[in-house]
Design a protein with these regions (language model features):
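Short, Lys/Arg-enriched anionic-surface-contact patches
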Residues: 1, 49-69
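Short, basic interhelical loop/turn and adjoining N-cap
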Residues: 27-28, 90-102
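Short amphipathic alpha-helical segments
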Residues: 8-10, 18, 25-38
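Short, solvent-exposed alpha-helical "recognition" segments
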Residues: 41-46, 82, 103-116
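Helix-turn-helix DNA-binding helix
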Residues: 32-33, 100, 114
Length: 140
């Protein structure tokens, strides 16, 4: 997406805190502000969704619960209708069904982001299993 110049007037305290945080994260104030706006709007639009992780690896999650991609990955593994899968996952995890639905709604609005996380995790699992197999072969 192309960047456009936009002007904001910030109070001294907001400006100071923005610049201090950006410096701690090693990014520009503009990059931090953009991330905060996107994440802030997402959390306003999707009740129960928060962002966690380091600045370079932010991911959507349920407040006090798993990451959204983890919920979607598990729902895919389950069988049944959407509501049956939600009920099963809620019973397995003690995550309220409404929060599972919130995660699913977020994922529907951000499919590329969630799919990327799922694929990356599946790749890491495959690589880990292969490395374990190779270690066992060395010791056989």
């Amino acid at each position: 997406m192309a960047a456009r110049s936009t002007s904001f007037r910030l109070g001294d305290e907001a400006r100071r805190r923005l610049h201090e945080r950006a410096e701690r994260e090693g990014i520009s104030a503009t990059a931090l502000l953009e991330r905060l706006i996107i994440e802030g709007v997402d959390t306003l639009e999707h009740a129960g969704i928060v962002y966690r992780g380091a600045g370079h690896d932010r991911r959507a999650a349920l407040a006090g619960g798993p990451d959204v991609w983890e919920i979607v990955a598990r729902l895919r593994e389950l069988e049944g209708s959407e509501e049956e899968r939600i009920a099963t996952l809620a019973a397995e995890t003690d995550v309220y069904p409404r929060l599972v639905r919130a995660a699913l709604e977020f994922a529907a609005r951000h499919p590329a982001e969630i799919e990327h996380r799922i694929v990356s995790n599946e790749r890491a699992i495959t690589e880990s299993r292969e490395a374990a197999k190779q270690r066992r072969a060395l010791l056989a």
